[in-house]
UniProtKB/Swiss-Prot annotation:
Disulfide bonds: none annotated. Keywords: Ribonucleoprotein, Ribosomal protein, RNA-binding, rRNA-binding. This is Small ribosomal subunit protein bS6. GO terms for biological process: translation. InterPro entries: Ribosomal_bS6, Ribosomal_bS6_sf, Ribosomal_S6_plastid/chlpt, Transl_elong_EF1B/ribsomal_bS6. It holds the Pfam family Ribosomal_S6. GO terms for cellular component: cytoplasm; ribonucleoprotein complex; ribosome. It comes from Rhodococcus opacus (strain B4). It comes from the Bacteria.
Length: 95
């Protein structure tokens, strides 16, 4: 298992209280494949450096994950298919 940090920028029209539960549905992919969610940190609504899909703000969430590369690729694919997700970025930690 490798350690990853996933940053997700969500549509600012979403209610911030529902961000963590909605992300949890995607994170079930990691749990089903034997991975572990170390931390979910919702930063809230922040201004973007440049517009993404005509949005100047986004709701940021940072998630620390321990999983296999295939599991993280599947998670990133599923997040990319969701219309409320503006952008994702996956980084591998060297712990």
């Amino acid at each position: 298992m490798r350690h990853y940090e996933l940053m997700v920028i969500l549509d600012p029209s979403l209610d911030e209280r529902t961000v963590a539960p909605s992300l949890d549905t995607f994170l079930n992919v990691v749990r089903q494949d034997g991975g572990k969610i170390d931390k979910v940190d919702v930063w809230g609504k922040r201004r973007l450096a440049y517009e993404i899909l005509k949005h100047s703000e986004g709701i940021y969430a940072v998630i620390d994950i321990s999983a296999t590369p295939a599991t993280v690729a599947e998670l990133d694919r599923q997040l990319g298919l969701n219309e409320s997700v503006l952008r994702t970025k996956v980084l591998r930690h060297n712990k």
